[in-house]
Regions:
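C-terminal non-catalytic regions of proteins with extracellular/luminal or membrane-system context
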Residues: 1-357
Length: 357
């Protein structure tokens, strides 16, 4: 809230008072430990649309330039995502299949805001994704959502949000991971979960049903190799386009909501004059000129450098994994005013081109 007011936004005091009230203390994210390190049942626990009384809803139109919805999750070291949540994605009870989907309460808020937008009470709907990872992004296809900003885990960086939304600063980052339309289409889920050793009792490890389950009672076998995230989605799409054998059916648009490296800016940029030269024994030097072609906004531009390697006979015969595209480095301009240019020089070590057997 301070970020918004510091940037010049007028924040609805009625809604703010609800979220800070004792009655609404029940609505907060949390986790319930299930008896071992890293084994937590996570709770989304956002307030449903029905929790907003008539006074709260009527106050919205007085601040109707935009409704900002924050979608948050927790998780990290010691708090693995179990693929399900305490409150689930159904109607508030039971266990849902995916903690990273919107749950029923969040969907009800979004639907309520859409109704207010349709009636003219609010003009825009903005979604902020407050999570260090990626939630399931199918809902972003909704045309009633005017803007979305992945803000990660905020910390001291939260102060920038208001200035980004109001246009004092142009966004210049890019997504550090793939945002899936449906997490079930992510191949890592095939191996994800808690697999218990069948003979754990022989070694004095607590039984899975015991009260003090040991951290050492479970295991995971990783099978996906290099084909994680964008290295999977882009490689499979290339195989489809090239007619590679055994690729199967693959609809990129129904799998990827936003690709790795996706990012927008208020400014427009044009890249030109790219050259690649070899220097020394192992360096490749990429030069590219970036020009801000917009008339109004200044901003920085992130320029990723990818390598695409041929999948030759040797790799095929020896079953060497070669993704169709790999990020090897990136550069970023200074703040460019409209019409201003900068030439970036990005040096890439040849070792990053290697494939490992």
């Amino acid at each position: 809230v301070d970020s918004l007011t510091d940037a010049g936004f007028a924040v609805n005091p009625t809604i703010q008072a609800l979220y800070t009230s004792d009655d609404w203390a029940q609505y907060k994210r949390g986790s319930e430990n299930l008896g071992s390190f890293g084994n937590n049942l996570l709770s989304i626990n956002d307030a449903p649309w029905s929790a907003f009384d008539a006074d709260a809803r009527s106050s919205v139109s007085q601040y109707g330039d935009a409704a900002i919805m924050v979608i948050g999750r927790i998780g990290g070291e010691g708090t693995d995502l179990l693929g399900k949540s305490k409150d689930g994605i159904d109607n508030g009870d039971g266990i849902g299949p995916d903690y990273l989907q919107l749950n029923a309460n969040e969907t009800s808020i979004l639907d309520g805001l859409k109704e207010m937008k349709a009636s003219g009470e609010i003009k825009h709907i903005i979604v902020l994704i407050n999570y260090a990872g990626m939630i399931e992004g199918d809902f972003l296809a909704d045309p009633d959502i005017d803007a979305a900003l992945w803000v990660g885990a905020l910390g001291v960086g939260g102060e920038a949000i208001g200035h980004l939304l109001i246009g004092d600063v142009s966004p210049s980052g890019r997504l550090p991971d793939t945002m899936w339309v449906d997490n079930a289409k992510n191949p890592v889920l095939v191996n994800y979960g808690r697999n218990y050793y069948s003979n754990l009792d022989e070694f004095g490890i607590t039984d899975p049903d015991g009260a003090n389950e040991s951290t050492f009672s479970t295991y995971t076998v990783y099978q996906e190799g290099m084909y994680l995230g964008y290295k999977y989605t882009e490689t499979r799409y290339e195989d489809l386009v090239l007619g590679t054998a055994n690729v199967g059916d693959y609809d990129y648009a129904s799998v990827v909501a936003r690709p790795f490296g996706f990012g927008l800016s208020y400014a427009d940029f044009e890249l030109s004059g790219m050259s690649v030269t070899r220097e020394g024994d192992r360096d490749y030097v990429v030069n590219v000129t970036v020009t801000n072609t917009s008339d109004t906004y200044s901003g920085k531009c992130s320029v990723p450098v990818y390598v695409s390697k041929p999948y030759g006979d040797y790799a095929r015969e020896n079953q060497i994994q070669v993704p169709s595209v790999e990020l090897v480095d990136f550069g970023k301009t200074k703040i460019l005013a409209p019409g201003e240019s900068e030439t970036l020089t990005i040096t890439v070590d040849e070792k990053l081109f290697a494939s490992y057997d």
